[in-house]
A protein has these predicted regions:
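Short microdomains enriched in Cys/His and/or Lys/Arg
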Residues: 205-244
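Conserved phosphate-interacting/catalytic interface
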Residues: 1-186, 232-584
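Residues immediately within or flanking Cys/His clusters that coordinate Zn2+
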Residues: 188-191, 223
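Surface-exposed, flexible loop/turn segments at secondary-structure boundaries
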Residues: 202
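Short Cys/His-rich metal-coordination motifs, predominantly Zn2+-binding knuckles/fingers
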Residues: 197-199
Length: 584
């Protein structure tokens, strides 16, 4: 995965220089060329601030260490720049950080003369007091001590000065050499082979660029570590911290910035987890099978199989060389107490992905509950939603397994089958139509898990299905409609009273229900009674020697599918002359 991320950075030209990172600055304290205070102004056209593609940056681990609290170069938090904090505990570290901010400004004055005016401004207690009073008046939204701030001298921001990158590169290298000389970066282990490039390097002591964008799924707002060894149990051979996965600082930053960029552009949150897909070579949006799975508006989902077949044929004929040999990658992530949890990682050929997505929609195809037509192909999140009461209840691990089933043409997880069955059963007992995506997933499970899956598992009713459990479900559907035709609404009917028992112990229950059906048949006129009698006999004839005494999870799910498809079939094909009489 890390090699794929490094390749993405190289292919896209993603800038990942140590000591620089994207930042968004919300405020600027302003002064003239002599350092006289002029005011505080917001930056950017929106409430978030002004985004910079690359600014000089120190890693969080470098800001707090044995040398005391340090500041960011030429920008920092409002609390430290203005000594503005409502929390008494924050005032000492903010003062220390403010002093370090001034120290960095002084070190830059020879290269960036405007920094001298900034030093004059921020060393003046009266100017700082006026700035604190002014910033408290800003908003909405109101300023916060943790907002980021820089200095504007005249009409130019310090961070925008042309000499800044060269000054910071030299200063940053000096800082790194100082850390190496104290052993914090080099330690006793010396040079090592870079895990990603194979070069001989001085490995980074920690990987300081955090993975951001996972705050809503267990991560921290400030980011989480992907490669981390902060416990002795995680280390080997006496290596400390991230030397257990030795990489130069540049390599560590490249994989982190690549993943951050992919999260921002491609990441999709799917019920407690984030799926981040990409391709080795760029793929147009209309050719992206991942989009078909996740977003799948109806018109897209309906043509997904045809589009996949078209792309596959083009690859085989050589008319789409851009797709032939292309590879896909997808990582499923969530946050966990400051660390990134990699829940799944898949990769493969584009051709395999297109075929898998086409099969996903084919296997999910199922009739509407009214039997009128095939249901619209469900979005991925509709499938997940059919397994739980609310999407937030979906386990991230289950979402990852379902994603793998869709993208890799793997078996539907058994845990998903159990949940889909439970939700469908509740709907049947309440005399409601179940979520069609749940029944579709049950069908897909059996399509992929059984040797007879593909010919037997049809979108519509299959009267020749090879499994008795399926026909047992069909029989209960017919008996329920027979009761309604004979008695009308009776409150708790056959389904409410016997569905659970019949789906678990069919031999014990269905025989008794067949015997009781004679009472219902006697209440119907001859033609309708004969019609129902033939239906019951036809289904019973599928049982063979005997009904199973008990049904396991797979059998109960086939029972539910047979029940559903029989109801859909009858609703669509009931005899016109008897429509009202047998309508349930």
């Amino acid at each position: 995965m890390l090699h794929a991320l490094l390749g993405y950075a190289q292919r896209t030209g993603l800038h990942a220089e140590p000591g620089f990172s994207p930042q968004t600055i919300r405020w600027a304290i302003c002064a003239d060329d002599d350092g006289n205070y002029l005011g505080v102004v917001p930056l950017g056209s929106d409430k978030k601030g002004l985004a910079f593609r690359l600014l000089p940056t120190q890693a969080q681990s470098a800001l707090v260490g044995k040398g005391g609290v340090r500041a960011q170069p030429l920008w920092d938090t409002v609390g430290s720049v203005l000594l503005w904090s409502k929390d008494e505990k924050r005032k000492p570290p903010d003062r220390e950080r403010h002093d370090n901010f001034l120290l960095l400004l002084r070190s830059a004055t020879e290269v960036i003369p405007e920094c001298q005016a900034a030093v004059t401004l921020l060393s003046d207690p009266d100017a700082l007091g006026r700035a604190r009073a002014d910033i408290e008046k800003q908003g909405p939204p109101a300023a916060r001590p943790e907002d980021k701030m820089t200095v504007r001298i005249g009409d130019r921001l310090l961070v925008d000065m042309a000499a800044v990158p060269a000054w910071w590169r030299e200063h940053y290298r000096a800082l790194q050499k100082a850390r190496e000389s104290t052993g914090k970066s080099r330690g006793e282990n010396g040079a090592m082979l870079d895990l990603l490039t194979g070069d001989v390097v001085t490995p980074a002591y920690t990987h300081d660029t955090k993975i951001k964008g996972l705050a809503g799924i267990g991560g921290l707002p400030q980011g989480d570590a992907l490669v981390s060894f902060d416990k002795a149990a995680f280390t080997s051979f006496g290596l400390e911290k991230s030397r257990n996965a030795a990489m130069a600082e540049e390599s560590a930053k490249r994989y982190a910035e690549s993943l951050n960029h992919l999260i921002q552009t491609n990441g999709r949150i799917l019920a407690g987890a984030m799926v981040v897909p990409w391709f080795k070579e760029g793929v147009a949006a209309e050719d992206d099978p991942f989009t078909w799975i996740v977003e799948a508006p109806e018109h897209t989902a309906r043509i997904a199989e045809a589009r996949a077949a078209e792309l596959l044929e083009a690859i085989r004929k050589g008319t789409r060389p851009d797709l032939a040999g292309n590879r896909y990658y997808a990582v499923t992530l969530s946050g966990a107490a400051g660390r990134v949890m990699v829940r799944d990682w898949i990769e493969g050929e584009f051709e395999e992905l297109a075929a898998a997505v086409a099969a996903w929609f084919t296997d999910l195809a199922i009739v509407w509950a009214d039997g009128s037509a095939l249901a619209s192909p469900p979005k991925f999140m509709a499938v997940v939603g059919a397994l739980v009461r609310e999407l937030k209840d979906a386990p991230a691990s289950l979402v990852a397994e379902l994603w793998r089933a869709a993208a890799r043409r793997k078996a539907v997880p058994r845990a998903a089958l159990a949940r889909a069955l439970g939700r469908a059963r509740l709907a049947f007992l309440a005399d409601e139509s179940p979520r069609v995506a749940g029944l579709a997933l049950i069908k897909a499970y059996h399509t992929r898990i059984n040797s007879w899956g593909y010919p037997a598992m049809q979108p519509y009713l299959n009267e020749n299905h090879p499994d008795v459990a399926y026909h047992a479900g069909r029989l209960l559907a017919v008996l329920a409609r027979l009761q309604y035709a004979a008695l009308g609404e009776v409150g708790a009917g056959v389904v409410q009273r016997y569905y659970i028992a019949a789906s678990q112990t069919p031999a014990l229950v269905l025989g008794r229900l067949i015997g009781n059906s004679k009472n219902h048949l006697s209440k119907l006129d001859g033609g309708l009674s004969f019609w129902f009698e033939n239906r019951i006999a036809e289904i019973v004839g599928r049982f063979g020697d005997r009904l199973p005494r008990t049904l396991d999870l797979e059998g109960q799910s086939l029972f539910a599918l047979g029940y559903y498809q029989q109801l859909a079939h009858d609703r669509a094909s009931r005899p016109a002359a008897k429509e009202e009489a047998i309508n349930a």
